[in-house]
Amino acid sequence: MLTAEEKAAVTAFWGKVKVDEVGGEALGRLLVVYPWTQRFFESFGDLSSADAVMNNPKVKAHGKKVLDSFSNGMKHLDDLKGTFAALSELHCDKLHVDPENFKLLGNVLVVVLARHFGKEFTPVLQADFQKVVVGVANALAHRYH
């Protein structure tokens, strides 16, 4: 999946990410850009507009929770399937989340990182990071196969 050099680059970069800010924005953007994903978050209250979604405290809190789990995965890049096994089971068996949504969230996360870090998020770093989000999405979808 990743070379030692790529792992070092994404791990060093991830240390700069403010998971509370980036997580809330990434989940919020997912819900705005792909509105059908909102059905999994009906208990979050007002999701009636982009502004409502992006300022919703439950969206922000859950986005942080999602990125906290992602951060754990960043510590276990060689065992993403094992790291995300319980979450894969939860999302498959209990929540019935379409596994395509994991890919969508990963892509939205890359957009948010580019927005937050600008030129520091180079094309090479983006390519390395894209491998990570694909790996995480595949690990989360593992239970579905």
UniProtKB/Swiss-Prot annotation:
**Domain of life, per the record?**
Eukaryota
**Modification sites for Phosphothreonine:** 11
In this UniProt entry, the residues modified to N6-acetyllysine are: 58, 81
Mind telling me which Gene3D superfamilies this protein's record contains?
Answer: Globins
Modified-residue entries (Phosphoserine), positions: 43
Q: Does the keyword Heme apply?
A: yes
Q: Name one GO molecular function term.
A: heme binding
Where in this chain does the record put each Globin domain?
1-145
Q: Name one GO cellular component term.
A: haptoglobin-hemoglobin complex
Q: Which UniProt keywords apply?
A: Acetylation, Heme, Iron, Metal-binding, Oxygen transport, Phosphoprotein, S-nitrosylation, Transport
Q: Where does heme b bind?
A: 62, 91
- What SUPFAM superfamilies does UniProt report for this protein, alphabetically? Globin-like
From the UniProt record, give one GO term of the biological process aspect: hydrogen peroxide catabolic process
Report where it is expressed, by tissue: Red blood cells.
The cross-references to InterPro entries, in alphabetical order and at most eight, read: Globin (IPR000971), Globin-like_sf (IPR009050), Globin/Proto (IPR012292), Hemoglobin_b (IPR002337), Hemoglobin_oxygen_transport (IPR050056)
Where in the sequence is S-nitrosocysteine found? 92
Protein family per UniProt: Belongs to the globin family.
Q: What does this protein do?
A: Involved in oxygen transport from the lung to the various peripheral tissues.
How does this protein assemble? Heterotetramer of two alpha chains and two beta chains.
What is the protein name stated in its UniProt record? Hemoglobin subunit beta
Which species is this record about?
Bos mutus grunniens (Wild yak)
